[in-house]
Amino acid sequence: HTYAPSIETVPFQGSDPLAVSKEIRQYLTVHPDTYAIYTCSARFTYHISQCIRQLGIQDRIQVIGNDLFTESRQALSDGILRGVIDKKISKQSALAVKTLFDYLLKKDYPRSSCLVMEPEIVLRSNFQSHSDLQK
């Protein structure tokens, strides 16, 4: 940690969000001075948000989640999440399907072998105006 030597990273690994959430809940109980959590997937964002809500510690911990979906929007609104890294999964999927459709049916070859979809950082302060939230 060259940039922040006083920060200790504690990775939690596993593919079962419920099991990892339980492990994090236990960790937070033993280490109440934990300052922040970053979750790298939408599934884990949901479960960690639920854990923080149930523990009632949203005022003392900074949680950054991944992807905008109904529950992460609610967690932002409720102050459970401080921010979300929106990878625009639905737009990525739509672009992939459109590109494949155009290629297979229209013989329209993609202009590039790499299609870039820039992620966005959505914070509590700007999520109400975020374009993906407009219904």
Regions found by a protein language model. Give the residues of each.
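Short helix-loop-beta junction
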Residues: 1-4
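Residue-level recognition of short, well-ordered coil/turn positions
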Residues: 32, 57, 80, 107-108
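Short, well-ordered alpha-helices that flank and scaffold nucleotide-derived cofactor binding pockets
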Residues: 50-54, 78, 98, 102
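Flexible loop/hinge segments that line or gate small-molecule binding clefts
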Residues: 69-77, 81
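Conserved beta-strand scaffold positions in the cores of enzyme catalytic domains, especially
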Residues: 7-11, 63, 84, 121
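Hinge/cleft segment of the Venus flytrap/periplasmic-binding protein
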Residues: 88-135
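Short beta-strand elements at the ligand-binding edges of bilobed clamshell
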Residues: 78-90
